[in-house]
């Protein structure tokens, strides 16, 4: 049994006093009772749905609040954190010690004299590189969320649990002094890397706790040479590991969920001396337009112990997954064992031999697959390119490019080149190959079919792409296969999908200009400057 007196003393050391009761690492059964009990009001209230899962609302915060994210500027962070600047804006805004202390006082005062849920878990399936996390909250469903998302310790591990990092969630409190303190709003998500504490105020969005710890793994791991990556990962029957990087909507979850392979994880991973390991103990899946037919694994994972966020629940308790009236970002969190085809008992495997960058190019320029050199790997990893189609009033659809460093700029705490260095070093040691896979559009105006994309992924994973005869795509100087089994050869060179190849040329020059302009911010150090040659040249 965990010594609750010890836990109370540790809470007092944080500034949380006169706690009425500590509900320590509650069971799923207990959480279910707590979040559905009569008398709960507002966003604390859980609603039982016909799926068996409980649904909650997070109010106006239906996604992360990057504008309210701050990191304390001190001796430890001043020269290590990738701070926002005029030339390279990001979400790492500095906060002084006095402001931090006032926010900490607000949160600890909010949590004092309350009945609290304290959940201890691990971030990272690697014993050597994990962070022991303690989450303190007064809200039952928030305790449920972190029980789903972090790795659940055994009874034995809980006996002597020493937290490396504490998340204090004070979602009910806001900051009245934000204007004088020069902050963005009354809400805050603040980190102190010296005290190893995250404070949350004002926002009820569950993902702040998950992505907050991801940002911290992104700080601590690369500094000791361990990869920290925004990617999904799976492993084949022979132990061959593949990792899939990609921004939202590029196919990261869909393509890594493969009946022929076991899932390691769907979102956050590390790469250490043993191999690839999941940071999480659960999945946080989008549910908008979810159907059993299209995503059977996720659909079937929504049952008792899963937690739905911001979905529309009908009067009979059924869920309308097509209703995005609260937000398009409807979500479900569930423990990873709700998915059948997973790596057990620990979500980790050997070194990755295939590294896949997914992009959905709405410009119709990039090839469906290309093999990258080590320099190109760094260049396209730092660029983190994808493009969306946005409708205009005349009915013309124009592509909007997105460049997100390392396919996850919102969560990077160090300079992007540090992640690229670690990735390429790990890849070289493992003899891994990198591929750029475009799941977007080509000259036909249609999106590349999921059948062809799956054929491409199969060719990468079974090694047949290595035997293919290769050509080169000009401007980008990318190596592209001339034929692949099960894939329409007519699409492999994007120029061939245009009736007029000059059209591809002009679009390629346009996209090149955007890549070049975006990459300027990385040319501030020698490594960055050296990579310019690996990018496209008009």
Curated annotation (Swiss-Prot):
Class of this enzyme: lyase
Co-factor remark: Binds 1 Mn(2+) ion per subunit.
Binding-site residues for substrate, renumbered to this chain: 64, 205, 211, 331
Subcellular location per the Swiss-Prot or TrEMBL entry: Cytoplasm
GO cellular component, one term: cytosol
Cofactor: Mn(2+)
This protein's record includes keyword Lyase: yes
Binding site for ATP: 211, 230, 246-254, 295, 331, 447-448, 453
Residues noted as binding Mn(2+) in the record, renumbered to the chain: 211, 230, 267
Catalysed transformations (reactions): oxaloacetate + ATP = phosphoenolpyruvate + ADP + CO2
Protein name as catalogued: Phosphoenolpyruvate carboxykinase (ATP)
Organism per entry: Haemophilus influenzae (strain PittGG)
Gene: pckA
């Amino acid at each position: 049994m965990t010594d609750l007196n010890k836990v109370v003393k540790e809470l007092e050391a944080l500034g949380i006093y006169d706690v009425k009761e500590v509900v320590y690492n509650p069971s799923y059964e207990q959480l279910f009772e707590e979040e559905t009990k009569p008398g709960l009001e507002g966003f604390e209230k859980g609603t039982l749905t016909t799926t068996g899962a409980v649904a909650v609302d997070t109010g106006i915060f239906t996604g992360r609040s990057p504008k309210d994210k701050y990191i304390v500027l001190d001796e430890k962070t001043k020269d290590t954190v990738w701070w926002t600047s005029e030339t390279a804006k990001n979400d790492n805004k500095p906060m002084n010690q006095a402001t931090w202390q006032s926010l900490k006082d607000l949160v600890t005062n909010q949590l004092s004299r309350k009945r609290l849920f304290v959940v201890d878990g691990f971030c990272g399936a690697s014993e050597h590189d994990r962070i022991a996390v303690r989450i303190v909250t007064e809200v039952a469903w928030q305790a449920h969320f972190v029980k789903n998302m972090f790795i659940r310790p055994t009874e034995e591990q809980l006996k002597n649990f020493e937290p490396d990092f504490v998340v204090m969630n004070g979602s009910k409190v806001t900051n009245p002094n934000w204007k004088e303190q020069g902050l963005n709003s009354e809400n805050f998500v603040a980190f102190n890397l010296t005290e190893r504490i995250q404070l949350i105020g004002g926002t009820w969005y569950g993902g702040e706790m998950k992505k907050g710890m991801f940002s911290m793994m992104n700080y601590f791991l690369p500094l000791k040479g361990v990869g920290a990556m925004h990617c999904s990962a799976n492993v084949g029957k022979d132990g061959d590991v593949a990792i899939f990087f990609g921004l939202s909507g590029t196919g990261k979850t869909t393509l890594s969920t493969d009946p022929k392979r076991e899932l390691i994880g769907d979102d956050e991973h590390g790469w250490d001396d043993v191999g690839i390991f999941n940071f999480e103990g659960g999945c946080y899946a989008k549910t908008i337009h979810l159907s059993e037919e299209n995503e059977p694994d996720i659909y079937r994972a929504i049952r008792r112990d899963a937690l739905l966020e911001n979905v529309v629940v009908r009067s009979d308790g059924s869920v309308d997954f097509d209703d995005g009236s609260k937000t398009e970002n409807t979500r479900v969190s569930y423990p990873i064992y709700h998915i059948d085809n997973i790596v057990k008992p620990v979500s980790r495997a050997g070194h990755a031999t295939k590294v896949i960058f997914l992009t959905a190019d709405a410009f119709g320029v990039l090839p469906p697959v290309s093999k990258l050199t080590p320099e190109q790997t760094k260049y396209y990893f730092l660029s983190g390119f994808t493009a969306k189609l946005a409708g205009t009033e005349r009915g013309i659809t124009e592509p909007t490019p997105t460049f997100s460093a390392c396919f996850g700029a919102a969560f990077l705490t160090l300079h992007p080149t540090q992640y690229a260095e670690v990735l390429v070093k790990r890849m070289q040691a493992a003899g891994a190959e990198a591929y750029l896979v475009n799941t977007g559009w080509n000259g036909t105006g249609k999106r590349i079919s999921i059948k062809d994309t799956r054929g491409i992924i199969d060719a990468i994973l079974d090694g047949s792409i290595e035997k293919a005869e290769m050509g080169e795509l000009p401007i980008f100087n990318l190596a592209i296969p001339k034929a692949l089994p099960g894939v329409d050869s007519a699409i492999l060179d994007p120029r061939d999908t245009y009736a007029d190849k000059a059209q591809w040329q002009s679009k390629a020059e346009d996209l090149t200009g955007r890549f070049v302009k975006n990459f300027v911010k990385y040319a501030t150090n020698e490594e960055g400057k050296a990579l310019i040659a690996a990018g496209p040249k008009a």
